[in-house]
Amino acid sequence: TNVFANDVSEIKNIVIHKDLKVYDNVIFSDKNDKKINIKEFNGNLLLLNFWATWCEPCKEEMPSLDRLQVNQNLSNLKIFAINISQESKKKVDSFFEDLNIENFDPYFDAPTTLAKTFSLRGIPTSILIDKDGKEFARIIGSINFDDNIFIDWLKTYN
């Protein structure tokens, strides 16, 4: 058997940090403009997915991301899909409806605040944050969130 069969580094686009990164103020809004601070979710495994409706790879990965939220082996996972391009709530809602996204809500970044905080180079980008609030990995570009290698790896942080 291949020892590396479950090696997440085989999945392109995943960057695993040796030095965990801590961010002080990671704040974004829900669709009612209520502010959300990720500190409220310490103790949870967080996936912050940055996206826009015009982004084709974002559109491709969103359904598998939606399924990831209800994966029974990842009960501690919270997904925040954060729109970073100041699109109208109406446009974002219809994007979610068209793709049948049902397991998480859209969130909104104040004009590119988090894009700067996380030094995003493009979208989609997903930031993975452990139970202590530290970024331990990021996914630059899209992946298939149904990938069992990815899910098994993520379970180790759950």
Located regions from the model:
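Structural microenvironment flanking redox-active thiols in thiol-disulfide oxidoreductases
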Residues: 60-99, 110-117
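Soluble periplasmic/extracytoplasmic beta-strand elements of cell-envelope proteins
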Residues: 49, 81-83, 138-140
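Thiol/disulfide oxidoreductase modules built on the thioredoxin-like
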Residues: 97-102, 109-153
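Short active-site neighborhood of thiol/selenol oxidoreductases, capturing the structured segment around
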Residues: 36-59, 65
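Active-site acidic short loop of glycosyltransferases
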Residues: 41-44, 74, 101-103, 120-121
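N-terminal "domain-start" segment that seeds a small globular fold
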Residues: 4-38
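Extracytoplasmic
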Residues: 21-23, 41-43, 74-77, 87
